[in-house]
From Swiss-Prot:
SUPFAM superfamilies for this protein: Aminomethyltransferase beta-barrel domain, Folate-binding domain
Recorded GO MF terms: transaminase activity
Organism: Ectopseudomonas mendocina (strain ymp)
A Pfam cross-reference name: GCV_T
UniProt entry tagged with the keyword Glycosyltransferase: no
Name this protein carries in UniProt: Heme-dependent oxidative N-demethylase gamma subunit
PANTHER family for this protein: AMINOMETHYLTRANSFERASE, AMINOMETHYLTRANSFERASE, MITOCHONDRIAL
Role description: Component of the heme-dependent oxidative N-demethylase (HODM) enzyme, that catalyzes the NADPH-dependent oxidation of dimethylamine (DMA) to methylamine (MA) and formaldehyde. Functions in bacterial methylated amine catabolism, linking alkylamine oxidation to the tetrahydrofolate C1 pool. The gamma subunit of HODM may act as an aminomethyltransferase involved in the detoxification of formaldehyde released by the alpha subunit; this process requires tetrahydrofolate (THF).
């Protein structure tokens, strides 16, 4: 069990479900429960699942300089956000290399909340805010309960007026079970889902109520590792597990470009003035690898670190993998040489498995993103 400095208000709930509360981002996190991860994956893909993702870093930036601070730090045009709108963004270093991703929520005219993963973007923003008219608050009282899956909206519609009309990447302030919450139509699953931001004191009651009243919808508690299964299918990267910080280059320091990661879409069209912009644009066409999918033969999942071979030489490495009993496919995300990143290139997997595979475009599931953006 982790000796973490951040404590989830749902700690006792997770322990009761069989979690050992392994550390992530400084918080004891329910990576697994006593129940089967395949059941968690199936619930989120076919019904809905509830997950505690409070280990995400939630930081408020408030003041006259908040917008300009975030606009320079991220790849998005922050000025286009209005209160109630959010956007997925990346943060780069001066070398144009990826250091973090985040969601930026505009909560007021001069107020933003940034939700980070495990990169170093928060620390960079703290340094950049020094001497500027912006207050920074790391908010660990705020908990994040993620309700994901096709039935999530049906359940919430019984309790939150207007939730069906909330567009993708928008949020609203409301009440859930008579407790104040911010509900955001975001998630990390590829499904239509919602993140429920609430006070720590309210998190256990909201968690319990969703699971109790959501039984008729098939809602179950889901462990953090289920996200790995979902993200493989939906092409969602997880720093540092897909990055050169985990799989280092032989002769270069760690640091991946957005072109290599397939995250260049996060740069707002025409935006030039952001940290690392010059190097970002210069590095286009100089990809050392590409993130791409791998479809494996058989009914077993590979493991991170398994190598990929083509014509007798190593051409890549698997970073995350899963087997879906819903589709009966064994799938993986991989770092491969650029010429291998084409549909159908034959591969051999070596390591925990020894099997044939092919390079496969990402995402495997819902490539047009119709599920997560559905209306009504």
């Amino acid at each position: 069990m982790a000796n973490s400095w951040r404590i989830s208000a749902l700690r006792e709930r997770h322990l009761a479900l069989g979690s050992q509360l392994e550390d992530w981002n400084g918080m004891g996190t329910a990576w697994t429960y006593a129940s089967d991860l395949a059941d968690h994956h199936e619930a989120i893909r076919t019904r809905a699942g509830l997950m505690d993702v409070s280990g995400l870093k939630k930081v408020h930036y408030v003041g006259p300089h908040a917008e300009s601070l975030l606009d320079y730090a991220t790849t998005r045009d922050i000025g286009k956000l209005y209160p109630g709108k959010s956007v997925y963004a990346c943060l780069l270093d001066e070398d144009g290399k990826f250091i973090d991703d985040c969601i930026v929520y505009r909560t007021g005219p001069n107020a933003f909340m940034v939700v980070h993963g495990a990169g170093t973007g928060h620390e960079m923003l703290i340094r950049s805010a020094q001497g500027r008219q912006v207050a920074v608050l790391f908010d660990d009282d705020l908990h994040d309960l993620s309700l994901q899956g096709p039935r999530a909206v049906d359940f919430l519609a019984e309790h939150v007026p207007g939730i069906r009309d909330l567009p993708y990447f928008h949020h609203l302030q409301t009440k859930l079970f008579d407790r104040p919450v911010m509900i955001s139509r975001t998630g990390y699953t590829g499904e239509r889902g919602y993140e429920i931001f609430c006070k720590a004191a309210d998190a256990p009651a909201i968690w319990d109520a969703i699971l109790e009243q959501g039984k008729g919808y098939g809602i179950i508690p889901c462990a953090f590792t289920a996200l790995d299964w979902l993200r493989v299918e939906s092409y969602l990267l997880f720093f540092p597990y897909d990055n050169s910080q985990m799989y280092p280059f032989a002769d270069q320091k760690a640091g991946d470009t957005l072109w290599e990661l397939g995250l260049d879409f996060t740069v707002s069209p025409g935006k030039q003035d952001f940290r690392g912009a010059g190097e970002h644009y210069r590095l286009k066409g100089q990809e050392r690898f590409k993130i791409f999918g791998v479809l494996l033969d058989g009914h077993q999942a590979a493991q991170g670190g398994d190598t990929l071979w083509h014509d007798g030489r190593q051409v890549g490495v698997i970073t995350c993998s899963m087997y879906s009993r819903l589709t009966e496919r064994s799938m993986a995300i991989a770092r491969v040489e650029p010429q291998i990143a084409e549909q159908g290139v034959p591969l051999q997997v070596r390591g925990s498995l020894d099997c044939a595979a092919i390079a496969h475009s990402l995402p495997f599931d819902d490539p047009e993103k119709k599920k997560r953006t559905a209306k009504g």
